[in-house]
């Protein structure tokens, strides 16, 4: 058999209907020159928020929290693209000590799920399409500069967990990917605002984004979260709500895709919530604590109680607290 001139049909879905059926608002095919609309029935479904993944761009950046379907949709796109066009795909992350730490398993699972097992050869950590000769390779970028520089000819690059990719790695990888029409797909959950991936690929465009999307002839940047995923699972929703209740800062980072404000030095970082309560007679306390502040440090005082939950677990309740900068010791309440 020979390679096809166009891809299968992608259905763009904005929501699920009451009966659970996807509401397909557009049907698209990838072609040799771009993307075209069709009336044919789709065989691949992707959320509306990820539609720009299908259109040619040098850089495609998708960032946000867990449950958005970022990685799953990129995997579907790359597998289908390799079925109709000869592709040499590099799947990278900053550190990859073994193939188990790569996206290899996700790609193989997608091949099996779509029933393409006869088309692909998946052996020894490499994936090859029998007809198009497309090939997927998996590497870590860190301390691998020579190997990466030797990968000239890559047509597609998929960078996962890109929040961890260093400036040195970007400076090595980007010039290596120089084939005509080559694409670099960057997927990540933001961590710190100083991370190179953020400063290179999102920060320059953040003020130009409209409804979380920026695009020009060279780059598309999309903020995508669980609210944009019609197939956000009930299990993930339960996990999200649990995290939101007990560890709000972590919830904002993991699911809302905001910066990680947690400090590992904070003993109770993310492990607190604000509630209305009255101390119970069974609780230990009251315990009073004070920390005298100097210069710009606040003087703080607390009245606390401890609830013994058993099994070595305890809840700490802060009933009253006070904090003020520039407080004279003689004025301490």
Residue ranges: model-predicted function:
Residues 71-85:
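Walker A/P-loop NTP-binding motif
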Residues 98-155:
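Inter-Walker segment of RecA-like/P-loop motor cores
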Residues 229-293:
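ATPase catalytic-site recognition across NTP-hydrolyzing enzymes
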Residues 303-333:
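Nucleic-acid-processing active sites and adjacent nucleic-acid-binding tracks
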